[in-house]
UniProtKB/Swiss-Prot annotation:
The keyword Chaperone applies. Belongs to the tfa family. Keywords: Chaperone, Viral release from host cell, Viral tail assembly, Viral tail fiber assembly. One of its GO terms (biological process) is virus tail fiber assembly. This is Probable tail fiber assembly protein. The keyword Chaperone applies. PANTHER family: PROPHAGE TAIL FIBER ASSEMBLY PROTEIN HOMOLOG TFAE-RELATED (PTHR34413:SF2), PROPHAGE TAIL FIBER ASSEMBLY PROTEIN HOMOLOG TFAE-RELATED-RELATED (PTHR34413). InterPro entries: Phage_T4_Gp38_tail_assem (IPR003458), TFA_Chaperone (IPR051220). Chaperone involved in tail fiber assembly. It comes from the Viruses.
Length: 155
């Protein structure tokens, strides 16, 4: 659909919507002056029919898709690009950090019980299992993401 010639008002609120081609963003026409003053207006923004705004701005993207732009400058759904190696490594580092924090939270009171000579046999065994898990986590090389063999969390 070519949106260049179509400006349709929303019959409910009479608003004109714009699709920002450079920023892949949506703008309410009633706030155009504010966007310009704030320096956030997309100079390639174009008015779109409300049906286009509704489809692309008010509904979630289909699974595996993200907002993109057609050759004519209209919004379209495009395939989500595969994650970069850097993104995969960052995700693995974040996961590792979260798992390490979780292990610390479990280990701390168990270690307190040992230190105060109050630990049960079960607590001693749990502490050993959780410390082993934490060591294995710490040894993980996140640069191998996404091919990481994550250790199994103790029960």
């Amino acid at each position: 659909m070519d949106c260049n010639r179509m400006v349709i008002m929303n019959s409910v609120n009479e608003e004109t919507y714009y699709f920002g081609q450079r920023k892949l963003a949506w703008f309410a026409g009633s706030m155009k002056k504010d966007y310009i003053e704030a320096g956030s207006w997309d100079d390639k923004a174009k008015a779109v029919p409300y049906s286009v705004y509704r489809e692309f701005a008010l509904n979630p993207a289909p699974i595996g898709k993200t907002l993109g732009i057609s050759e004519k400058g209209d919004p379209i759904w495009v395939d989500i690009p595969p994650k970069t190696k850097h993104q995969l490594i960052t995700e693995a580092e974040d996961k590792k950090s979260g798992l390490m924090q979780g292990a610390r939270e479990v280990i701390s009171p168990l270690q307190d019980a040992i230190d105060l000579e109050m630990a049960t046999q079960e607590e001693t065994q749990k502490l050993t299992a959780w410390k082993r898990y934490r060591v294995l986590l710490n040894r993980l090389d996140t640069s191998n993401a996404p091919d990481i063999d994550w250790p199994k969390k103790p029960e």
